[in-house]
Amino acid sequence: MHLLGHTLQFLSINPIGIGFGQHAGNLAIMQHGESAKCQAMYEVCWHIFFQGFHVRTHDFFNRQAQKLLVDNGFVVIPAQNPEFFIVYETNRYDGIPNFITTDAMLHNYHLFFNQLLKTVETQYLIPELKKLNTGMLAESQKQYESLKGTAWENAARRNVAFFAVGNRLLDPQAKIPEQVKEEVERELALIEAHQETAVSPVMTMGKSPDVLESLKEDYTQYIPRGHYVKSEELKNYFKTMMWYGRLTFRLKDQDEIRSAVLMTLALNRGENLKNWENIYRTTAFFVGKSDDLGYLDFQRILAEVYGNAVSLKQLATDSSQWELFMKKAAKLRPPAINSIPIFDETIQPDREREIKGFRFMG
């Protein structure tokens, strides 16, 4: 059994035999039945017969371990085996049978998967993400300049802040655009503190924060874990992907959906879509596709409503087409799993309305 990063060895002691299962790092001895609760366990050494195998085990119990064994039927104590195969090899020389449990196989698979993922992220995905950050931030700034003075200005400004946060998380030396500096710095402070659930400063841009209606984010999710603690580069990648994968532009908020539409258009520019697909398809292969709405969903509806060459001017001036887009978007699927902090059903009874929306990276 894999337990808190250690490997345990199990010996099952009963009146007729003993069974073995090895996990390096600790040795656990388990007993079953009243007859196993005997003071013979205190002896310097003892002998057990297991279907013809003769096993000699030296005393490795202190008084506390002896008491726990008698009281609970099992005890876990330190051993000198850092990996499974060492125990198996030792048992082979000593003539001790191995009881190999499925977790030993799964652990090996996990080690292989983890190393493969880390290699792909370090050598391939991080460089792609840097290019995507640069391209999306630049395109968002162009959109903002073009949409000033329109109903879409705030949505465009939010996108500048959104990608400025992602860019700064991946590259701590990256510059923050002046027009969004205050909101970005407050967002980054919440991410780096990673201590609470709070209203997102970036997602509430252009309106007063409302604890009920504003998008709330669980900032404790930004604590790097697993292989992501191995380097600063991986820590930064983890936080950036968490940011892009968690923030939801909800269908219930028209201004947030404007941001999602502008992101979709920005992805269609230059190399942005290629970089996005390289990241998304690779991560989807490893961990599965997103169940949230994303680029592919919005691009399909945009093409249905506006055609294949929608312009920013068309978005900002044609209200009838925008209304049609919103109606079609409302019919899209809800997410299968919710990760947005919301209140219980007595306060927010329409769960789908609260969580349904667009995510940049799913």
Model regions and ranges:
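Charge-rich, low-complexity amphipathic helices
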Residues: 22-33, 256, 263
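Compositionally biased, low-complexity intrinsically disordered regions
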Residues: 6-13, 24-25, 36-39, 50
